[in-house]
UniProtKB/Swiss-Prot annotation:
Family listed: Belongs to the class-II aminoacyl-tRNA synthetase family.
Disulfide bonds: none
InterPro entries for this protein: Aa-tRNA-synt_II, aa-tRNA-synth_II, aa-tRNA-synth_II/BPL/LPL, Asn-tRNA-ligase, Asp/Asn-tRNA-synth_IIb, NA-bd_OB-fold, NA-bd_OB_tRNA
Protein name as it appears in the record: Asparagine--tRNA ligase
GO CC annotation terms, alphabetical: cytoplasm
EC number: 6.1.1.22
Gene: asnS
Signal peptide coordinates: none
Amino acid sequence: MQVVSVKKALAGGVEEGTKVEVRGWVRTRRDSKAGISFVNVSDGSTFDPIQVVAPNSLPNYEKEILHLTAGCSVISRGTLVKSQGKGQAYEVQADEVQVLGFVDDPDTYPIQPKQHTLEFLRDVAHLRVRTNTFSAVTRVRHRAAQAVHRFFDEEGFFWVNTPIITASDAEGAGQMFRVSTLDAVNPPRTSDGKIDWHKDFFGKEAYLTVSGQLNAEAYALAMSKVYTFGPTFRAENSNTTRHLAEFWMIEPEVAFADLNEDANLAERFLKHVFKAVLNDCAPDLKFFEERVQKGVIERMEKFINSSFERIDYTEAVEILKKAKKKFEFEPEWGKDLQTEHERYLTEEHVGRPVVVMNYPEAIKSFYMRLNDDGKTVAAMDVLAPGIGEIIGGSQREERLDVLDQRIQKFGLKPESYQWYRDLRRYGSVPHAGFGLGFERLIVYMCGLQNIRDAIPYPRVPGSAAF
């Protein structure tokens, strides 16, 4: 008896006639007048369930098999044979169907064998992975994560685990979750009535990280090429389809690199991940194409086969101003591009991915390298058709005197960045990197409309369930 996954059984990874054991959960059960039950069983390993053919000669047929409903857990043992019906290559002719767990009340079980709204499924996030949509999202997410690690490994990068608890604000925006063990009702105070953070767990104010970039820079300036891939937190009160309070970030950092090399890396990276998902998740993408958003497969294929257009920010603003299109937000130099602007550039002006480069210094972060014009920084955004910005990156400011000016201009506390300044004091070199919200990538590949559906348990303003 060979224990096999549904994926392996359906793909012909086991010789026909082999005695197999398949473990999983019931999707549907159909009974014939001939005294045979056809039970579709899924174990999450692939999109399609496998059909288990259970005859009424099985000893538990009347008592258990005829009472199987969606969600019941079973172990099926029998012979793997070519399927007589349409829709799948193989099925299991059962000698035994062991029922491990019934559903308490099938009528109130949240995941019924029907189509549910995504809004409803967010309220049962602990069960929604049992649906076609979310099991497919999970497989795509897994395959994409594997592709991320494989890409950077093949490119000679080292994976660095940066801290989740930090005293530095990498973005300088102040939208951070505080980490504290002090009594929230009656915290210790200094003589002037302020909270005495010296008595907190870390002896100072601490926060959940908004980015691993600053720490990654330190490692890049010794290891040459590193990347982070981990959870990130933003206390941004944005209740939109594009924002999460907790998400996963991919952040490579490369020593001796400039902005153009950074853009080249971003292009190679995205194409690698898309190729991996297209190659390995075909059944899942077919489902997204048919049931979620038409065109997702073609969009990814075009993305892979396109060269990225590079446009200077100043040029992009001029293009938008001349466009014969009414925008909700008028394009103006010195303001960030809105999603409508980004999509116009990629979908109507160019027709492929765009890298916008050299943004006004006032609208970008303190660590970005100031260009010679004194007005712009060596920053870039990679824009993708259908979604807009998908990657943000920059060449980092490697000159200590300029970095100090930027820290002061942004009103940051210099004492919090002494270690970061050290990187410019001890063998500083030009370096660059970018950041990519992993969930935004999943949204793009799956054709989802809401980023809350791209992560198992979404954390958003007003909600931290499960």
